[in-house]
């Protein structure tokens, strides 16, 4: 058996020691166990010394032409450790012939077996190992390597690989047969690389080997530093004594808890990760799934969700359940306006882009010994999206995770209500509340902060409460992807070059969607202005113009765009916290004042800072219907009422000096009566499915949403509960549902 030891004393790169992990004993008693066990395994498998590698190996993986050998030598020099090239140092010495001769001698399938056997008979410690391009295709040998090192995937753009292989005059690699192009083979190989890596280095076009080597070392440092990426409450007050430990949460804890114990919302303690211009350019030709994997890996530490597992979740979330293979395509409407279509998911709204992924994240993060009840308040679209998303979990997860969604009984469209009711499954229920969305949302926050009630549920039923509204970081984060992807699509389609600015116009109620666009800008997307579009419930427009958030004498109006019929915009707190340099004391004062006095005023300096990036206006009901009518008549495209609100505002305030991406947040068929009124179609008092067929007969763009049509057929057989607008009544419903599901 081959065995390599460290050639010399390793250079110490870090001296970070671990402190013990303490498990809280309050109402969130067991929420940390899942990550604690993961960290224990990570530390046990990696930290044999305080140096960067210790006795473990750095294993470089990637396709032929990725630069594994060259980069490995540079890293070996930097760390002063042994460098092993599997081709030269293992295979050829074992076989006494060149790799190409062996491949020609035994053929593709037998070559993989022979290669795997050679690797299984090899061991090393404290070394840099450069794999062959085909090593990851042999499971047993990869498990053998993985248990004694960290695998770093050198992810090189496909066109760069093909160019390099031509220069290297390599035209035969394992698996390539006559009639198989190099491009197709390299694409096929990706599935194996994605299966094994612990950390990915995204190699932008033109990056030098030295730059890639530095990225590898940084990726390993991040992989080791399991305590570096934490979350704090927006109401967290930084201690004056810098030596005092900051109360922070890991990503998995933030997802599980949903709302901070002090009533604030979780946000990253540090800055958002930023991609370089070259990295963004390398994503221009990528698919939505590939973009999501790169971006979310940067935002979620592998100790919370291993990169390969996260990739599996993303592929599951954005698969055949979306009617469009592009997931969130961008369509040119007219002039400088583009429509970002966010309604191709199973429930026809932008909420699907988060809620097809978030349940898988949640199920991964929670410990296996606890039950969880997800409480959701919906203004229309969230309810059905949450119920649909959590219904797609596997059988075991559905037995320990249940959902109840509260919606305003008379505050959503008839179709939305039908859709929410029709989305009920064995682990999800809908409850109508005789009030508005703001009551539903506030009630859920109060339930979370009722420690007596939540503690009782934990002790009596072994059940912990959590949320899937956009107050939950795991729900908000995936929305960043589609804003970034929309910009990349404009570059890909040739409308702009990378670096050119764009504006985004977003129909806004709870501030989550537009906040995700802010985070996309922080990651490097050049968004110039965020245009906040309100309907008659224009509290956000007034706030952006004046800095005064005033709910006094303001009553919620029911409009054609019910999903933004919101007065208390929860995610605004996150943005104000960001603008105020993470001043938790200020957030506590402002939002306590909002709760007690129903208004607050921010200082002039914050108003000016807000207005540097934000523009806002509102749209009347008549203007909304007129926009739907005129857009259809000029382009054959039907806007839903929320998108129409955004278009009216974009037409009014955008200066047309750069493209504006209008977020289309729902499919028009969810609001058939309003659409028929706008198009001056004589409204018929028939079923929702009949209305959809009627609209479908117009052959407009976008086409009829088949999943919505199927859902309307199901709901007519479903029942649901209605309750009074009373906190105690809602709590009683929650307890009864827990009894039915988990006892």
From Swiss-Prot:
InterPro entries: P-loop_NTPase, Shikimate/glucono_kinase, Shikimate_kinase/TSH1, Thr_synth_N, Thr_synth_N_sf, Thr_synthase-like, TrpB-like_PALP_sf
Cofactor(s) the protein needs: pyridoxal 5'-phosphate
Positions of disulphide bridges: none
GO cellular component, as recorded: cytoplasm
Keywords of this entry: Acetylation, Pyridoxal phosphate
PTM sites of type N6-(pyridoxal phosphate)lysine: 351
Positions carrying N6-acetyllysine: 281
Keyword Acetylation applies: yes
A Pfam family hit: SKI
Homology family: Belongs to the threonine synthase family.
Listed name of the protein: Threonine synthase-like 1
Organism: Macaca fascicularis
Source organism phylogeny: Eukaryota, Metazoa, Chordata, Craniata, Vertebrata
GN (gene name): THNSL1
């Amino acid at each position: 058996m081959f065995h390599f030891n460290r050639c010399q004393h390793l250079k110490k790169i870090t001296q970070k020691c671990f402190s013990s992990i303490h498990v809280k004993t309050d109402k969130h008693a067991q929420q940390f166990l899942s990550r604690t066990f993961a960290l224990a395994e990570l530390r046990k498998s990696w930290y044999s010394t305080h140096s960067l590698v210790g006795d473990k190996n750095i294993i470089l993986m990637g396709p032929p032409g990725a630069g594994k050998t060259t980069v490995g030598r540079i890293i070996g020099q930097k760390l002063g450790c042994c460098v092993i090239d599997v081709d030269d140092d293992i295979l050829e010495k074992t076989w006494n012939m060149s790799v190409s001769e062996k491949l020609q001698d035994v053929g593709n399938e037998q070559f993989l077996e022979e290669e795997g056997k050679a690797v299984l008979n090899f061991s090393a410690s404290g070394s840099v190992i450069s794999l062959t391009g085909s090593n990851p295709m042999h499971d047993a040998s990869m498990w053998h390597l993985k248990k004694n090192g960290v695998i770093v995937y050198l992810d090189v753009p496909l066109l760069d690989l093909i160019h390099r292989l031509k220069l290297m005059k390599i035209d035969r690699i394992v698996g390539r047969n006559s009639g198989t192009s190099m491009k197709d083979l390299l694409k096929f190989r990706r599935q194996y690389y994605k299966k094994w890596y612990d950390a990915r280095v995204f190699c932008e076009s033109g990056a030098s080997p030295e730059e890639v080597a530095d990225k590898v070392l940084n990726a390993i440092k991040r992989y080791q530093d399991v305590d570096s990426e934490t979350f704090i409450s927006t109401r967290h007050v930084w201690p004056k004594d810098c030596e005092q430990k900051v109360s922070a949460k890991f990503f998995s804890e933030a997802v599980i808890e949903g709302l901070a114990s002090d009533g604030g919302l979780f946000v990253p303690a540090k800055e958002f990760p930023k991609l370089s211009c070259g990295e963004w350019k390398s994503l221009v030709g990528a698919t939505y799934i590939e973009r999501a994997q790169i971006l979310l890996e940067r935002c979620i530490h592998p100790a919370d969700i291993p990169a390969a597992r996260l990739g599996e979740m993303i592929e599951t979330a954005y698969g055949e359940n979306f009617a469009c293979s592009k997931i969130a395509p961008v369509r040119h409407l007219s002039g400088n306006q583009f429509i970002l279509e966010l309604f191709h998911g199973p429930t026809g709204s932008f909420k699907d882009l988060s809620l097809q992924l978030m349940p898988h994240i949640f199920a991964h993060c929670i410990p296996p010994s606890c039950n969880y009840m997800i409480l959701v308040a919906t203004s229309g679209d969230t309810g059905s999206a949450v119920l649909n998303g959590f219904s797609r979990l596997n059988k075991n997860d559905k037995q320990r995770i249940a959902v109840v969604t509260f919606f305003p009984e008379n505050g959503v469209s008839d179709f939305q209500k039908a859709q929410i009711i029709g989305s009920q499954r064995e682990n999800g229920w809908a409850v109508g509340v005789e009030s508005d969305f703001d009551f539903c949302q506030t009630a859920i926050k109060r339930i979370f902060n009722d420690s007596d009630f939540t503690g009782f549920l934990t002790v009596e039923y072994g059940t912990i409460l959590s949320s899937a509204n956009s107050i939950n970081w795991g729900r908000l984060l995936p929305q960043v992807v589609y804003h970034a992807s929309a910009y990349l699509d404009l570059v890909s389609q040739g409308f702009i070059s990378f670096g050119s600015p764009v504006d985004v116009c977003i129909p806004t109620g709870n501030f989550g969607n537009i906040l995700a666009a802010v985070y996309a800008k922080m990651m490097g997307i050049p968004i110039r202005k965020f245009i906040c579009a309100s309907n008659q419930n224009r509290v956000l427009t007034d706030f952006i113009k004046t800095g005064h958030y005033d709910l006094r004498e303001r009553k919620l109006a029911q409009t054609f765009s019910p999903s933004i019929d919101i007065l208390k915009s929860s995610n605004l707190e996150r943005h104000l916290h960001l603008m105020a340099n993470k001043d938790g004391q200020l957030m506590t004062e402002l939002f306590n004042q909002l709760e007690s006095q129903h208004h607050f005023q921010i200082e002039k300096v914050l108003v000016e800072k807000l207005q540097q990036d934000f523009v806002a206006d509102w749209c009347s009901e008549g203007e909304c219907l007129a926009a739907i009518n005129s857009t259809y008549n000029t382009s054959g495209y039907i806007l839903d009422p929320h998108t129409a609100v955004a278009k009216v505002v974009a037409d009014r305030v955008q200066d047309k000096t750069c493209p504006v991406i209008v977020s289309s947040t729902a499919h028009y068929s969810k609001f058939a009566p309003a659409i028929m009124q706008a198009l001056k179609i004589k409204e018929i008092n028939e079923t929702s499915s009949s209305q959809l067929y009627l609209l479908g007969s117009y052959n407009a763009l976008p086409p009829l949403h088949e999943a919505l049509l199927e859902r309307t057929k199901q709901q007519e057989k479903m029942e649901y509960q209605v309750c009074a607008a009373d906190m105690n009544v809602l709590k009683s419903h929650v307890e009864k549902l827990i009894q039915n599901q988990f006892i």
